[in-house]
């Protein structure tokens, strides 16, 4: 049910690729078994294997799926400027938005640590940035749905099930409500979110 896994599932749906999903139990250390480490030495989830080609890091997988299987380039346009904005949003999602989620919530969920107010401020700052990016925008990067929207909707929906108040950020909230309607695989994403919700 993690955000990175769900972003890959939605991207696959958007390009019409049927994934043969294998679920690993991280608590039981299945990702550390030699057969998985042989595929992905970094032993991170998600990992994609496509006809013997292994790739990990969800946003890299998203781009690969679109470039290899997309009928058009609309989800990741070839125009360098459009692509640059999408990349910026993907890196923002990875290094700022989703990272703020991991830094604040994971210690509470997995180590039973108390909430860290400083880490919470980083979440608020990340949402302020996203709110600014989305000023007057229907989509996260450009004028149509891209892999940036898919990655961000996976992250933002995770904040929602964790109880974060997205509605405080008007532009994010408006974008998110639209993204729920237009993102392929949203239903599966939300089902994964609800699985994840048990941790909160």
From Swiss-Prot:
Gene3D superfamilies named in the record: 1.20.1050.10, Glutaredoxin (3.40.30.10)
Source taxon at top rank: Eukaryota
Alphabetically ordered keywords of this record: Lyase, Transferase
Residue ranges of every copy of the GST C-terminal domain listed in the record: 79-200
Cross-referenced InterPro entries: Glutathione-S-Trfase_C-like (IPR010987), Glutathione-S-Trfase_C_sf (IPR036282), Glutathione_S-Trfase (IPR040079), Glutathione_S-Trfase_N (IPR004045), GST_C (IPR004046), Thioredoxin-like_sf (IPR036249)
GO molecular function terms listed in the Swiss-Prot or TrEMBL record: DDT-dehydrochlorinase activity; glutathione transferase activity
Residues that coordinate or bind glutathione: 2, 43-45, 57-59
UniProt entry tagged with the keyword Lyase: yes
EC identifiers of the protein: 2.5.1.18, 4.5.1.1
Record GO biological process: glutathione metabolic process
Catalytic activity annotation: RX + glutathione = an S-substituted glutathione + a halide anion + H(+); 1,1,1-trichloro-2,2-bis(4-chlorophenyl)ethane = 1,1-dichloro-2,2-bis(4-chlorophenyl)ethylene + chloride + H(+)
Record-annotated GST N-terminal domain positions: 1-73
Cited function: Conjugation of reduced glutathione to a wide number of exogenous and endogenous hydrophobic electrophiles. Has DDT dehydrochlorinase activity.
Subunit annotation: Homodimer.
Family under the similarity heading: Belongs to the GST superfamily. Theta family.
Record protein name field: Glutathione S-transferase 1-1
